[in-house]
Amino acid sequence: MSYSRQYLRFPSRILGREMEMLHFGHQGYPLICLPTSNGRFFDLEDRGIIASLSHHLEQGYLQAFCVETLDWETFFNRKLELPQRRDQWLLLEQHWVEELIPYVRDEAQNDFLVVAGFSLGATHAVNLTCRHPGLVRRCLALGGPYDVAALGSITGWDPKQAEQELYFINPLAYMSNMSRQLWDQLGGRNTDLKLLTAHHDHCLSDNLRLSEVLNRNGIPHQLEVWEGDHDWPTWQAQIRAFA
């Protein structure tokens, strides 16, 4: 390995704790990496995603920041009622926008921010990108489910209630009402949004549906459907190709 690896901790006033991350590379644009559901900041290294980016890291094209998503405190926290889970996620998003992203940009000394998410991490990446157009310059969403209200089988919430309570963090819902004019006005004109899925990905239909919504509303994006599955080998190949 000829690229640097750092374990970092930094205080979050918003969350009231220290947050952990891994930082790989020495120069290039910052790539924030969001793990799969209930994943940890070290999972993407363990699963070969960082190794897949070795050439990019060695050549100084990018720096990867693997961070926490705290799914067990938000979407999967069955001790909380649905509105409380939503509010916990919104608090996490506030941390990303106001603390994490400025910290990462400062560490990388580069403002061209790219976010990559895997499975539920892709849902977070799309939410961060689409709820804050212009903040993220490129979004790589790999194998994500985008109908958040329909995740009741793994989260325990009622889909009907979730349709109302989670509207503003449910990409398939709120992007249905996002016009191209509003998208551009909010800063999305220069956003490069890529939906990356595979023929045997169980989230394929959500990717097709979201792409259809974006096409209908004239919002630029790229949909890639590869041979493969909802699995690490597919994501390793895709992140290598598009990062």
Which stretches of residues belong to each language-model region?
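Non-catalytic cap/lid and distal C-terminal segments of serine-dependent acyl enzymes
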Residues: 1-243
